[in-house]
Amino acid sequence: MLHHHCRRNPELQEELQIQAAVAAGDVHTVRKMLEQGYSPNGRDANGWTLLHFSAARGKERCVRVFLEHGADPTVKDLIGGFTALHYAAMHGRARIARLMLESEYRSDIINAKSNDGWTPLHVAAHYGRDSFVRLLLEFKAEVDPLSDKGTTPLQLAIIRERSSCVKILLDHNANIDIQNGFLLRYAVIKSNHSYCRMFLQRGADTNLGRLEDGQTPLHLSALRDDVLCARMLYNYGADTNTRNYEGQTPLAVSISISGSSRPCLDFLQDVTRQPRTLQDLCRIKIRQCIGLQNLKLLDELPIAKVMKDYLKHKFDDI
C-alpha cells in the first residue's frame, strides 16, 4: 500500500529520498537532486525545510550544498516558529551556524524570534551551548533580546545554571540588573553563593527591590536566614535601612520570622547599630563611579596592587 502511494506521489518519494540522503550524509545524492531541479526550500508537514533537517542532524556538508543552491535560512517552521539557526543552537552546531551567518542572510537570522520571542541566543543559553553563544556574539547578536515573557538569554542561563554561558554573556556586557535586579535576587533565593559573589563583583546593584513587594536582596537574605549572602551584600553596599512596601527593613523582616537568635538576625543587628567605616564608604563610592562596564578594567588603573585588591573585595572574610 505504501509502495503504491509513493508511486502515485513522486514528490513525496523525492522528499523521502533526499531526506534519507541527508540523514546518511550522502552529499553526492543531495547535490545531484538539487542540480536536477529539486527545491531546497520545500517544506514538510512540520514546516521544516531541508536546511532545518540538516542543521538539526548536524550534516554540515549538506548545509553547505543547500546554501549554495539557494536555501533560505530565514524560513520558520510550524512547530514553534524556529529557523534552522535556532535548531543549530539547540544542538550546539556551531560550524553549521557559521555557514549560515556568513551568508547574505546574517542580519535576518541572527536575532530572528520564534513564536515565543526566543532568539538563537536564548536557545543557546538555555541549552548551555557556550561555544555557540560565543559565535553568535562574535557575529554581533543582540546580547539582551527580550522574549515575549520579558526574559533575556542571561536570565535563562542563570535559571538553567549554565555557568559558562553566564560568564560569556556578562563579559559581553549583558544587563546584570535586568528586570530590576532579578539576577542577584534569584541567586539569593537559591542560596547560590558563587553566583551571588560573581554578580556583586561585576557591579550588580544591591538595593533594587522586586516590583511586586519591594523586597531587596538583603530582605530576601533575611527571610532565608542566609548570613553569608547578607554579609556579601552588605560588604558590596546593601543599605540596611531600605524598606519594602510594608515598611520593613531587612532587620525587621529577620525579627518577624524569628523569636530567637539566628545568624542573619545577629549580623543585621550588629551592622544596623554601627555606621560603615569611611574606608568602606570610599570603596563603595569608587566602584559606583567606575561604573558597571569598567569594573573589569580595575587592573589597568594607575594605583597600587593592594588598592586594586581592596576594590575587588579580595580581603573580605566571606
From Swiss-Prot:
Protein name: Ankyrin repeat and SOCS box protein 7
Alphabetized UniProt keyword annotations: ANK repeat, Cytoplasm, Nucleus, Repeat, Ubl conjugation pathway
Organism from which the protein derives: Mus musculus (Mouse)
Sequence similarity: Belongs to the ankyrin SOCS box (ASB) family.
PROSITE patterns: ANK_REP_REGION, ANK_REPEAT, SOCS
Keyword Repeat: yes
Main location: nucleus
GO biological process: intracellular signal transduction; protein ubiquitination
Loss of function: phenotype: Asb7 knockdown disturbs the meiotic progression and cytokinesis during mouse oocyte maturation.
Domain notes: The SOCS box domain mediates the interaction with the Elongin BC complex, an adapter module in different E3 ubiquitin-protein ligase complexes.
Gene this chain is encoded by: Asb7
Quaternary structure, from the entry: Interacts with CUL5. Interacts with RNF7. Interacts with PSRC1.
Lineage: Eukaryota, Metazoa, Chordata, Craniata, Vertebrata
Pfam families membership: Ank_2, SOCS_box
Positions of ANK repeats: 13-42, 46-75, 80-109, 116-145, 149-178, 180-208, 213-242
Subcellular compartments: Nucleus; Cytoplasm
